[in-house]
């Protein structure tokens, strides 16, 4: 279950990252930010569905939470992107990357949870 979810999440991450690179260029790690934002929103939704017993915990948590979302999102790439921006002297971009990845992703996880919890 985890491997199946992981393979799907990794493929989507690659597609999104490559698409963002082609669309917006290399000046800022938009691909990493995009997958982390999407993954955070989906994790909030998953947590809400699990909390309300709408989906079964073990299979969904393994397939979606650990596998798919674990492979889709990436803390290591976020860390490396931030380090490279620092080494290149792009201090404002580095700070923006850190702030956006942390604050926006936390907000999106909260939003995903709220979307589920407010229904019924």
UniProtKB/Swiss-Prot annotation:
GO CC annotation, single: plasma membrane
Membrane topology note: Multi-pass membrane protein
Ways its activity is controlled: Na(+) is not transported, but it plays an essential structural role and its presence is essential for fluoride channel function.
Chief localisation class: membrane
UniProt subcellular location: Cell inner membrane
Gene Ontology terms for molecular function: fluoride channel activity; metal ion binding
Catalytically driven reaction(s): fluoride(in) = fluoride(out)
Pfam families tied to this protein: CRCB
UniProtKB keywords: Cell inner membrane, Cell membrane, Ion channel, Ion transport, Membrane, Metal-binding, Sodium, Transmembrane, Transmembrane helix, Transport
GO BP term (any one): cellular detoxification of fluoride
Function: Fluoride-specific ion channel. Important for reducing fluoride concentration in the cell, thus reducing its toxicity.
NCBIfam families: crcB, PRK14200.1
Family membership noted in the UniProt record: Belongs to the fluoride channel Fluc/FEX (TC 1.A.43) family.
Protein name listed in UniProt: Fluoride-specific ion channel FluC
Organism: Pseudoalteromonas translucida (strain TAC 125)
């Amino acid at each position: 279950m985890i491997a199946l979810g992981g393979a799907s999440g990794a493929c989507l991450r690659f597609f999104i990252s490559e698409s963002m690179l082609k669309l917006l260029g290399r000046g800022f790690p938009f691909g990493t930010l995009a997958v982390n934002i999407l993954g955070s929103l989906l994790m909030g939704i998953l947590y809400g569905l699990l909390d309300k017993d709408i989906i079964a915990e073990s299979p969904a948590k393994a397939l979606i939470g650990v596998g798919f979302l674990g492979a889709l999102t990436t803390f290591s790439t976020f860390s490396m992107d931030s380090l490279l921006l620092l080494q290149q002297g792009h201090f404002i971009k580095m700070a923006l990357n850190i702030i956006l990845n942390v604050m926006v992703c936390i907000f999106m996880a909260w939003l995903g949870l709220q979307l589920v919890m407010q229904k019924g």
